[in-house]
């Protein structure tokens, strides 16, 4: 799944989105559906003309190389889709955004969820939404500073 969080420049939570696909299929069989659903969200649910920039979390290093490959393929496809939509996009390492937003590059999932709920309320039905919200906050702060 691809989790998307939209914040405004005042870091108010606008909306959360999730592009999904049939997880019972092989990755190669479900990938087109996943990307189609991501593109549909961009076109039909988010007014992409109002999106100033986006940030994507870089693929994490996992012990299983198949997981790394799958994450890398999804990140590359999302990045390409955003670029083709003329949305300036950067990638950020998970340790970087965690350190900037939470004060520690090794922040836990519980730390992230607690921070997200304190910042935006209990609006995160899944951990990945809280992660995406903090990554979006990182992007807003970096753009204010002219870093991205």
Give names to the regions the model predicted.
Residues 1-148:
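Phosphate- and other anionic-substrate recognition elements at nucleic-acid/protein interfaces
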